[in-house]
Amino acid sequence: MSKKVMSVVILAAGKGTRMCSNLPKVLHLLAGKPMVQHVINTANQLDCTRIHLVYGHGGALLKEKLNNEKLNWILQEEQWGTGHALQKAIPYFSEDENILVLYGDVPLIEVDTLNRLLLAKPHGGISLLTARVDNPRGYGRIIRKNDDISGIVECKEATEIQKKINEINTGIMAINSSDLKKWLKQLKNDNHQNEFYLTDIIKMAYQENRKIIGIQPAHLNEIEGINDGLQLARLERLFQKQQAEKLLLSGVRILDPARFDLRGQLICGSDVVIDTNVIIEGEVTLGDRVQIRTGCLLKNCRIGDDSQINAYTVIEGSFLDKNCVVGPFARLRPGSELSEKVHVGNFVEIKKSSLGQGSKAGHLSYLGDAEIGSGVNIGAGTITCNYDGVNKHKTQIGDYVFVGSHTQFIAPVTVGDHATIGAGTTVTLNVPENELGLSRVKQKNIQGWKRPKKT
């Protein structure tokens, strides 16, 4: 293809009735992102000047979910076929530019395949992505004469002989805008669906002796569309398998690729081990020799070298330095920072707090809006009472503080270095360094007391 300005058109106006959902089809999630987002991301990797999105059902929600994208939004109020969708885009095409047609429900198309398609486009002709499949049911068939592509017949219009053809149309094509405009204006809807088929322009091109080149995808799953929940689930597993295989080949040890979900971007150091049923969301970085045990959810976090995340731990928006141990059943909420060799045990929740080097919170604690120094021991059942019903307040604990079990810090409050907090204390006043803070009620023993008996 000669070097010309190129625009991408993504068709995404379908209602997706077979999804049995009020959500627009192209907003259903694949690997944590709307399926149309995958197509947009792919288009953004091409040498294109503009991306047009033809939308219809659920337009307001589409714009809300894709508000960060630089798109030209084109409304198709009535869905009268793929040809009709492209007709709506005609006013936005520049003269003599190349147009690449993509589909919002075909999310796994690869950049390399599209680049091959664009390079193969002949001058004055069309390059068309086709595929040979074992079961062509539901797809339009490629019609050839003397091995040249002469047309496409939609499945519902095909004869019994044509239905035996196993070369299918994917709908993805590259075409010059001037030719596309001309042929779109000639489309008719005299077919079983009363729709304007984009595929009819292939016959028009052939009748004008234009060259039509068929290109095959590198992998068949690239051209699979999503029309129902079953197809979505199938492509989800295919995509997750692909991602797991790439990580395995890079040296990451994933114990069971079939039970691994990556819904974002994962960067791993060497000798990382990921157990079963781990979910990665957003941008996650794992250092060297990190171990992630079964059932963990990691989202937008960084975990330092030689750290271990034990089973069923949730970490979001947090930073962990080297040699940390977290979990099982722990939760690190956004804004949490753990320095080297910090231990956070089972049923500990940390929110917007920092723990200094070597500090430990072993079990059953809530630490919110806290700044905790190095070498601190947090006893079981410790709570920072950070909320007064209106505002959040901070708890500051110095280095080498010992906090006894079942302690409550009524923030704002400060505890100095090397202080000790007795078990069961409610801390309402600042505790100076090296002092013992204690608010325990004096114990009283009642002699001769007997338990009541059942009557």
From Swiss-Prot:
The top EC class, named as a word, is transferase
Q: Where is this region: N-acetyltransferase?
A: 251-455
Query: Mind telling me which CDD domains this protein's record contains?
Result: GT2_GlmU_N_bac (cd02540), LbH_GlmU_C (cd03353)
GO CC annotation: cytoplasm; membrane
Q: What reaction gets catalysed by this protein? A: alpha-D-glucosamine 1-phosphate + acetyl-CoA = N-acetyl-alpha-D-glucosamine 1-phosphate + CoA + H(+); N-acetyl-alpha-D-glucosamine 1-phosphate + UTP + H(+) = UDP-N-acetyl-alpha-D-glucosamine + diphosphate
Instruction: Quote the catalytic residue positions.
Output: H363
> Which controlled-vocabulary keywords does the entry list?
Acyltransferase, Cell shape, Cell wall biogenesis/degradation, Cytoplasm, Magnesium, Metal-binding, Multifunctional enzyme, Nucleotidyltransferase, Peptidoglycan synthesis, Repeat, Transferase
Task: Tell me which cofactor or cofactors this protein depends on.
Answer: Mg(2+)
Quick one: which residues bind acetyl-CoA?
A: A380, N386, Y387, S405, A423, R440
Question: Linker: where is this region?
Answer: 230-250
Q: What are the EC numbers?
A: 2.7.7.23, 2.3.1.157
Q: Give the InterPro entries listed for this entry.
A: Bifunctional_GlmU, GlmU-like, GlmU_C_LbH, Hexapep, MobA-like_NTP_Trfase, Nucleotide-diphossugar_trans, Trimer_LpxA-like_sf
Q: Where is this region: Pyrophosphorylase?
A: 1-229
Quaternary assembly:
Homotrimer.
Report the family membership: In the N-terminal section; belongs to the N-acetylglucosamine-1-phosphate uridyltransferase family. In the C-terminal section; belongs to the transferase hexapeptide repeat family.
Q: Which NCBIfam families match?
A: glmU, PRK09451.1
User: Could you identify this protein by its name?
Assistant: Bifunctional protein GlmU
- The gene designation is glmU
